[in-house]
Design a protein with these regions (language model features):
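C-terminal soluble interaction/assembly domains
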Residues: 296-394
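Secretory/export targeting leaders with adjacent low-complexity proregions
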Residues: 42-306
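Bacterial N-terminal signal peptides that target proteins for export
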Residues: 1-7
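N-terminal basic/disordered segments at the start of proteins
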Residues: 28-30
Length: 394
């Protein structure tokens, strides 16, 4: 859903939670978005056994993991996936065989300490160098919102989601090249303010929502479920973007003093724009990135064009991390307890199945939290440092 997607920098800033380390104070000027230094790899093989994480607790909670692995294997078995490998020292065959071997371990019925031991014997473990070359990764969350919507414009539904325009050009890897002009020249695609202000996409409307900020949330998250007037649910997913960098509206609201930094959240933004609808356009146009959509069947899809799974799918920078591969994360994540987000220490296996407009560095990782309002709350409470590992067959 993301490269789709999103950036959960919409979401909470400065959580302080015992256990896993919370993000450092702003004055320390840590940059989670620090680019990968030239010539370096994002993953470093762990050679000291003492530095390999304990997988035991994660081996007791394997729900939905097997299905998520199958989704990654479906992708890796497509010939088109081979163009993205090798990545560093990781080959396409190694990524595929590693998932197949891990799936066999799951199918064997091993769990807990026994599965932990088998993993340590059969797999090498790599760690992301993070934002500081010491493994520090900022974990944020994203989700699939569910909005009332329509595929036809009505008095209630006035705010469109647009299809990919015919003049948008991608390369063979799906990267945005720009806009093809009538003479064949390719130029940068216009930013959001020009697209919206000039009505460039008239006739390319895909669906309509009732609230302009809900449209923007769909842009940030990269997909949405629409509850249609007849009660049916439809999915609209990411098709492309205009090639511009993402800029956080949340940070703009804080900078302008509209919402205090210790109160910024998706819920606070929704509340602010409901009370100040005349400001929605002003703020969202500060983010030059514009997302185009397409109809999808079934569950929301990640950038691999495979379904994403709550807590089992992560979004990373696909230019530096091996897509579809098996990952392991240790951090603090919120879980739903009694219908409310409760933050807990977390370690779990995940699959690298998505990408995000704001997730462009070895120090960033976005965790998919599911669908609907509660998932949105969980995503909004996800802003925490941790460690990101990858597992490959020895």
């Amino acid at each position: 859903m993301k490269k789709r997607i999103l950036a959960s920098t919409l979401l909470l800033i400065g959580l302080v939670i015992s256990g896993c380390k919370a993000p450092v104070k702003e004055q320390e000027k840590i940059s989670y978005d620090r680019p990968l230094p030239p010539g370096e790899l994002a993953l470093r093989k762990i050679t000291n056994p003492a530095e390999i994480p304990d997988f035991t607790m994660a081996c007791l909670d394997l729900a939905e993991l097997r299905a998520a692995i199958n989704n990654s294997l479906n992708y890796l078995r497509k010939p088109s996936s081979q163009q993205f490998y090798p990545l560093g020292e990781i080959t396409h065959a190694q990524a595929t065989q590693s998932l197949e071997a891990f799936a066999k371990l799951l199918d064997s019925g091993l769990a807990g300490a026994q599965l932990n031991q088998a993993i340590r014997e059969k797999f090498d473990v790599y760690i992301s160098i993070g934002c500081d070359d010491h493994g520090t990764v900022l974990f944020t969350g994203y989700y699939t919102p569910i909005f009332d919507g329509s595929f036809t414009r009505t008095e209630r539904f006035q705010y469109p989601l647009y299809q990919q325009p015919d003049d948008l050009v991608k390369d063979s890897r799906g990267e945005i090249r720009g806009r093809r002009m009538s003479d064949g020249q390719i130029i940068p695609y216009p930013p959001r303010a020009v697209i919206e202000g000039a009505g460039m996409l008239q006739g390319k409307e895909l669906a309509w929502l009732s609230d302009p900020f809900e449209v923007y949330i769909a842009h940030v998250q990269g997909s949405a479920k629409l509850k249609l007037p007849d009660g049916q649910l439809a999915t609209v997913g990411y098709a492309a973007n205009n090639g511009h960098e993402y800029k956080s509206v949340a940070q703009e609201l804080v900078k302008d003093g509209r919402i205090p930094p210790d109160q910024i959240s998706l819920a606070a933004m929704i509340d602010y724009f409901k009370k100040n609808r005349d400001q929605v356009s002003t703020y969202i146009r500060r983010n030059a990135r514009f997302v185009f959509f397409k109809k999808e069947e079934g569950q929301p899809l990640g950038c691999l064009n495979e379904p994403v799974t709550a807590y089992r799918s992560i979004a990373t920078d696909k230019s530096i991390f091996p897509r579809a591969s098996l990952a392991f994360i240790t951090t603090t994540l919120p879980r739903a307890v009694g219908g409310q987000p409760i933050k807990q220490l977390y370690s779990g296996f995940a699959l690298d199945q998505d990408a995000g407009g704001a997730i462009r560095a070895p120090g960033r990782c976005d965790v998919y939290m599911g669908q609907g309002d509660l998932a949105g709350q969980l995503a909004g409470h996800t802003y925490q440092e941790g460690r990101l590992y990858y597992l490959f067959l020895k």
